[in-house]
Every structure is written in C-alpha cells, then in structure tokens.
C-alpha cells in the first residue's frame, strides 16, 4: 500500500533548546528487523557538561517508550482528546524500548525510569562531573515499533520514526528539562552531531533528514551510514514505496512521495 505523505522538516528555523556549537555526539549502530518490527541498537553518546554546575545525574529522552503504556503522559493526552487508539492496542502493538545495558566511561551505573514519565531515563553518575568535563555513555537497547499513532510507528510496511533513539535532555535554568513526549512537533532535543549506521532489508527504502555517506549491499541486507551536524530531530522513513525522496528547498529538507514535488 502506498501512502501519500509529505513531511516537511525545517532545518533553518526549527526551534530547540541547544547550544550554537555542540560538543555532544551520538554514534549509533542499528539493525532493523522486519520480522518483529524492531531495531537493535548499540550507541555511544559523548556528553560534555556545558553548564556551570557539577552534575550528578543525566536525563535521557526515550521517546519510543512513550507508546508502551496506557498510563504514559502520551496515552493520557490522547485519551483526553478522545483518541483511544493506544488504549485499544495490546502490549505487543504499543511498542516499547528494552534497555539491556548502560555504561558511563565503561563502568556500570544505576539508572531508572522517572516516575510518571516512562519515556525519561535518569542515569546516576558514579561521580559528579565538572563544568566542561566529558563522559561517554554506552547504551544497548531494542526498539519495538508501535502501531501507527500520531504519525509515528508502522502500518503495512510503512514505518515513520521521529527521535526514536536515546537523546540528551536539555539542562535549562540549573535543572534538567523533565518533559515527556506528548506527540507534538516541539520536541526539545539538544542539538548534536549524529553518525547513524543502519542495516535493513533491501526490499525496503530508507529516507532520512540525515545525509547518506555510504551504502553497501550484502545479500539482501543494505548497510548504510548517515551523518548530521547540529541535528535536533532525527527522521527515518522505511517503506516499500520507492517514490519517497529527500528534497532540499531553500535550506528546508522535505521528505515526500508527492509526485508534484519530486518532478
């Protein structure tokens, strides 16, 4: 089934809480499975304390897990707006993030999901980090993609994902921004440099706002590398619709399968 979808991503004017120069980066290695609609991820994230405070914890956004529970802030918002699509889904259809490992500078740390915010993770650092100090956080986790809700998820070999990978919360006014995903466009991601390596079935077509740097076919698996500088949001579309394209118009990236735009 083909979807007539046009997603416009404004790079020049996208508002976010971020720094002009990012010292944060995410190196993400991922494998997409069409069989169970999951993405296994190994991620190394470089974090520099750009505040004037000593930090004893780090807050991570896990937007994919917003869809995992009928008690999540996102589900409650949908219910209040008379959208019961998540409530009607069973647990396998709602999607979730399963984290198997979090290390800071190669050492085990304690972490938890913040009460009443199942899409926020608090990492307790083994020792405080000073201003301008750098740490490397290693994650291993699996993303299970939910049924299509609020333009996120999967339906009939069409998969649309926005900010599915783990990202840093902004630190504003001497505190972390504790803000759950509510399905809005104004998701406050810290601008970061991104390297994404993804393996997926070659019968699918991947489009992203990131720049493709390499592509390699081995059997029926495509291995591709994407990069982005000072990126707020990461958009991924996996589809069997080969007409999806990425266009750049006046510093605005457009992901579209609208023939009137492509031709």
Task: Identify the role of each PLM range.
Residues 6, 22-24, 62, 226, ...:
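Hydrophobic alpha-helical and helix-loop surface patches within well-folded domains
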Residues 8-16:
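Bacterial N-terminal signal peptides
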Residues 1-9:
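Bacterial N-terminal signal peptides that target proteins for export
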Residues 130-139:
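Short Pro-Gly-centered flexible turn/kink motifs
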Residues 15, 19-40, 48-54, 157-159:
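N-terminal, polar/Ser/Thr-rich
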Residues 82-96, 100, 113, 140-237, ...:
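Extended, low-hydrophobicity, Ser/Thr/Pro/Gly-biased non-transmembrane segments
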Residues 40-66, 71, 80-83:
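Ligand-binding face of N-terminal immunoglobulin V-set domains in extracellular IgSF glycoproteins
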Residues 196, 247-263:
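Juxtacatalytic substrate-recognition/specificity segment
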